[in-house]
Amino acid sequence: MQILILGFEYLPVKVGGLAEAVTSIAEGLSNLGHEVVVFTPSHGKEMGEPFTSFRVSAFGERVDVTVRKREQNGVIVYSLGGGVLDSPDIYGPGWDGLLRKAVLFGKASVGLMNKLIGEFKPDVLHAHDWHTVFALGLLRKYFGLRSVFTIHRLNKAKVPARYFHEANLDELVPYPDIDPEHTAAYIADAVTTVSRSYLLEEWDFFGLFEGKVTHVFNGIDCSFWNEDLIETRDLPREERRRRILENLGLRDGKVFMFIGRFDRAQKGVDTLLRAIELLSTDPSFSDMRFLIIGKGDPELEAWTRAMENRFPENVRAITKLLSREVVRELYGSVDFVVIPSYFEPFGLVQLEAMCLGAVPIASAVGGLKDTIIDLSSDPEHATGMLVPPRDAFALASAMIWAKELDDETLERLRENGKKRAREDFSWEKACERYVRVYGGRVDKAVSFLR
């Protein structure tokens, strides 16, 4: 099968989990024997060899589009540059800049497909998230491609109709303001999202496409998130933890780590900080250590640093981006990873942690509750703990319970987590299901079936 993938992020260009997902899907499909081609904006990165160039009319200007081609782990990647496509601000500059980039990406994708169509006529077009709506619409319009649209996280924004007019998609603009996710889902032959629970939680949207909507769980690359690859693999886990804490100026203790974006609307950092406040009055607090790692909302960053100043023996704030290799060392050393999200379409942190033996304590939402088996519900097969979202008291109570778990239970949680991540959530399984989606051979989400 010849498969064309559209994405605004593709490794090594990334902002969050989207790049990991799109790259893993493309490489996984290639590993299954399919011919996979990716179109992505350059975002100012000159990767690969010059392939072709052409001019595109957009926003009253003629833009010189340059295309570079590279092979990356069996996948052919075309980076489209020129004009705003070269802006290093992946989702910008600004809202207007992002929309202009998305429109230009759509038009440039048609130009590139014109160059390729003699040798590469995709059996399916797989577009990821709303930024690809113009490319999806135009490639369907001019080449009649069967298409799948995957929503990794609903954005719920509206786009002024003039951008669709600029993209030569007048037929898709019945209103002055357009929901690009609704439009992409409407024109696609199939719609997917990344977990069953998220699909049901957002049924007000996904239910509009009943009959062609389903879920495909994301996966995890356990060849990278692997305890055998960490530098301290020959040391007992307790010694790894002690060294990490010593490097941060902390005494040994049970470690609870948060790592992710400081996103006030989603990630629940404020819930964690309130839980730490509650724990500070509990006798268990003296033996608890909290690593809070991430960047984003300035107020949350300031609050996190204030907590470190207030509890210097217990809390460390790291408000910078860490390499994947450093994060892997942390997962292989800490005891627990805290994921207090308000919502989570799928989430990767819990599976990365499980691969490396860190036990997740997470909100019972979306993909988190689909991937984590809760200790209180199924002690024998449990892989972590689930708590209600936005409930600092429940989170604090779970962390106290976690701290007091005996070694046998902790080891069972770790081994169960490693097994579940590797066997049930591989990218190979995800890609096999995507192939069934492409061929229309997959179960559908239906309102009267649960």
Labelled PLM ranges:
Residues 1-450:
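Catalytic cores of nucleotide-sugar-dependent glycosyltransferases that transfer UDP/GDP/TDP-activated
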